[in-house]
Amino acid sequence: GASRASLDLPYWGPGDEWYHAPTGIEVDIVYFEAEWMEAQIYRLLRDHQPSLGYTTCFWHTLLTSIVLHDPRGWFTRLQDFARQDYPETLRQRIISFNHPVLRGVIPAYAHQIEKAVRRGDRVSVNHRTAALLASYFDVLFALNRLSHPGEKRLADFALRNCKLLPDQFEADLNAVLLASASASPDVNLAVTRLLDHLDELLENEGVIANSESL
């Protein structure tokens, strides 16, 4: 039985959540249409289309899923298709799509953060910092040929799994998060250091030229 339930939730796609009364475990179920999930995977692994942050999350979901019931074998077939090497074209496209929005184009996130700091707009600083980090991690995981695990424990996942990490990765990330919480001008310096170290790594790996780093 459930001690509390929230059913037929429409907010982040159809889903149900409840607390399992005997254990207190929170059960979280999200429903995906089979055709929709297929389209997401083919868009990624066949067509190699990048997104702005979180590009390979559904691929990661598929790869790490445990099949409990699959009477037609549909999910197993899709999972077998997904168990492939990281496509190099996809890797390059994720980086080339997400890297410029960090600070390489006029409306880049770093520039939006600078303007928000000047306005004293703490909500906007928080919002734009989150967007910057979404693309930052998309670039980092693509560089390492890792599927993106989603929004939780990203730093821990990177530290455990990324063979290639920017210099001062953990310190830079913590500095950005701490400074952005107060919308201090220090956030601009922290973002610059974070992105400088990412660009140094990308340049060393031959992924971008020096002229692309700013």
What annotation goes with each model-predicted range?
Residues 1-2, 132:
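Extended hydrophobic/aromatic-rich secondary-structure runs
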Residues 73-214:
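Conserved nucleotidyltransferase catalytic core and NTase-mimicking acidic/glycine-rich helix/loop elements
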Residues 3-117:
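Conserved NTP/Mg2+-binding pocket subregion across the NTase superfamily
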